[in-house]
């Protein structure tokens, strides 16, 4: 999860209210643009809930975002190594991650969904049924800690059974090709792909996952982002933004 394995090193400048010539106001952002609706590519542009939310902060501060795309592990590694000032792409706040990086206050709640193809008709009424199926998800996701710390001790599922991929794109491709039974997806990601792919929720984990912006340890930027989220961004405006991207 902390290994630095950058997949793409192409930097894009996203203007948010000031000139890119002012280097002091440039914020280096690490993303994984394969996590809709939080962060993804559309018509050659990087878009998403997380980006629009952080652009609101940037507009208030008069700064510029310099965005670099990575695979999931590379994104987190860029924050840990301080190659990036912040990372966002629907990143779950976990105790394990907080040992290596700092997080903003949570900006939204999330679910974790086990998704299958409609024609497989996989419905898990009891997690004891899980071990008969293959599960896949991107490397570096918080699901690994959940399986290791919660499911494995109970004999429900073993981490060495999991298939790991670079991003959700490869996970869903293998699911559709019949090489995978269940894809572990963030609830926000699942809500998008249910509209375009023949998939359904087979099981949903609720009540313990929250998204936040990730920062290097000791980041002063984190403090200012928290001040913006707490004192300047109205709760109703934040919820309207979330509803817009989840609709």
Model-assigned labels for residue ranges:
Residues 20, 64-67, 142-163, 197-203, ...:
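Ligand-binding clefts/hinges and TM-proximal coupling segments of bilobed small-molecule sensing domains
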